[in-house]
Amino acid sequence: MADPEVPVTTRYPLLSLLNSYSTPPHRIPAPCPWAPQRPTARRRLLHDLDTVDSRRSSIVDLSTHFSVQLHLQATTKDGNSVVVTLRL
């Protein structure tokens, strides 16, 4: 830090050209930086979709075999089609 006894105009002679310059009593501290925002993933909600077709589902229960198949098809407002098939 600068020595408080030395006038600032000695260190910076061009400041003496200003008539109304006065040395501030102390520096204003810099504000604390904000934490960066965490990126959030946008969830696709049901009302974001134009149509949802979940009619094609099948359940088979045999004595030696059990399976579940779920087929979902959705079309977005932009016309993109998404198909999800889940087989268990």
Curated annotation (Swiss-Prot):
Q: Which GO terms describe its cellular component?
A: host cell cytoplasm; host cell nucleus
PTM comment: the record says: Phosphorylated by host ERK. The phosphorylation triggers a structural change that enhances keratin binding and protein stability.
Q: Which UniProt keywords apply?
A: Early protein, Host cytoplasm, Host G2/M cell cycle arrest by virus, Host nucleus, Host-virus interaction, Modulation of host cell cycle by virus, Phosphoprotein
Give the Pfam families listed for this entry: Pap_E4
Set out the biological process GO terms recorded for this chain's protein. Answer: symbiont-mediated arrest of host cell cycle during G2/M transition
Q: Does the keyword Phosphoprotein apply?
A: yes
The misc remark on file is: The major E4 form is first synthesized as an E1^E4 fusion protein from spliced E1^E4 transcripts, such that the first few amino acids of the E4 protein are derived from the N terminus of E1.
Described by its record, this protein's role is as follows: Contributes to multiple aspects of the viral life cycle including viral genome amplification, suppression of suprabasal cell differentiation and egress of newly formed virions. Induces host cell cycle arrest at the G2 phase by associating with and preventing the nuclear entry of host CDK1/cyclin B1 complexes. Inhibits cellular DNA replication by preventing loading of host replication licensing proteins MCM2 and MCM7 onto chromatin. Within the cytoplasm, associates with host kinase SRPK1, a splicing factor regulator, and inhibits its activity.
Note the subunit structure. Assembles into oligomeric complexes. Interacts with host CDK1. Interacts with host SRPK1; this interaction may favor expression of late viral transcripts. Interacts with host cytokeratin components KRT8 and KRT18.
Please state which protein family the record places this protein in.
Belongs to the papillomaviridae E4 protein family.
Q: What is this protein called?
A: Protein E4
What lineage does UniProt assign to this protein's organism? Viruses, Monodnaviria, Shotokuvirae, Cossaviricota, Papovaviricetes
